[in-house]
């Protein structure tokens, strides 16, 4: 559905057989990560993959799954844009969940600039007004996954990073068609953001 709505191939993805819990080591601020976009280093080259948690697949409603996968797709496009311009090193990571949600919302492309599927856009905007929250899904994950002692991976928000050296950055091979599509999307995105400001 996401490929059809964007005319762009979805990146490699895999299902992680655990739930990822993120938070700050010095705070009660904790969040469940149902999916995340990860740049992996393979043979001194960078490949971007989407990691999906098993509980999302097991307990998420179809619209929720589509919204999360579309949101991660926006992260993928943002990351590819930054990789193509080698702007990757300047990103700041906060250990505060609220600051990360704000940063997430200001960096990503407008869904309407990427997707031509109104239902998918509606799912994204309703599920991610300011960070993702689905209380029914959270309750199911806590009750049927975490409390059942199924695998849980804990990470600190400020360690959810990948360090790249100059060789890895120079070995990046990006799809030319994707870069052309991103240029069109960025133009649409800029127009949408200007409209929203006025």
Which residues are covered by each model-predicted region?
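Short, conserved micro-motifs enriched in small and acidic residues
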Residues: 63-64, 68, 89
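Active-site recognition of the HExxH zinc-binding catalytic motif
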Residues: 67-80
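Propeptide-to-catalytic entry region of secreted or membrane-anchored zinc metalloproteases
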Residues: 10-24
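Post-HExxH zinc-binding segment in Zn-dependent metallohydrolases
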Residues: 81, 85-127
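Zn2+-dependent metallopeptidase catalytic core
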Residues: 1-11
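Polar/charged side chains located within well-ordered beta-strands of beta-rich proteins
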Residues: 1-3, 37, 51, 78, ...
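Pan-zinc metallopeptidase signature
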Residues: 114, 118-198
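Active-site scaffold of zinc-dependent metalloenzymes
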Residues: 26-63
């Amino acid at each position: 559905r996401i490929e059809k709505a964007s005319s762009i191939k979805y990146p490699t993805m895999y299902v992680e057989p655990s739930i990822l819990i993120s938070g700050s080591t010095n705070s009660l601020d904790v969040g469940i990560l149902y999916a995340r976009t990860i740049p992996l280093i393979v043979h001194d080259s960078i490949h971007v993959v989407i990691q999906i948690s098993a509980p999302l697949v097991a307990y998420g409603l179809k619209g929720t799954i589509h919204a999360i996968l579309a949101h991660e797709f926006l992260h993928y496009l943002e990351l590819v844009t930054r990789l193509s311009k080698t702007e990757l090193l300047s990103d700041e990571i906060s250990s505060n969940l609220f600051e990360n949600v704000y940063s997430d919302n200001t960096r990503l492309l407008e869904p309407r600039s990427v997707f031509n599927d109104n239902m998918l856009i509606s799912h994204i905007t309703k599920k991610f007004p300011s960070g993702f929250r689905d209380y029914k899904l959270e309750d199911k994950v806590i009750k049927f996954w975490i409390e059942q002692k199924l695998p849980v991976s804990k990470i600190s928000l400020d360690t959810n990073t990948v360090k790249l050296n100059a060789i890895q950055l120079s070995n990046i091979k990006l799809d030319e068609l994707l870069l052309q599509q991103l240029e069109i999307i960025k133009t649409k995105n800029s127009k949408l953001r200007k409209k929203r400001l006025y």
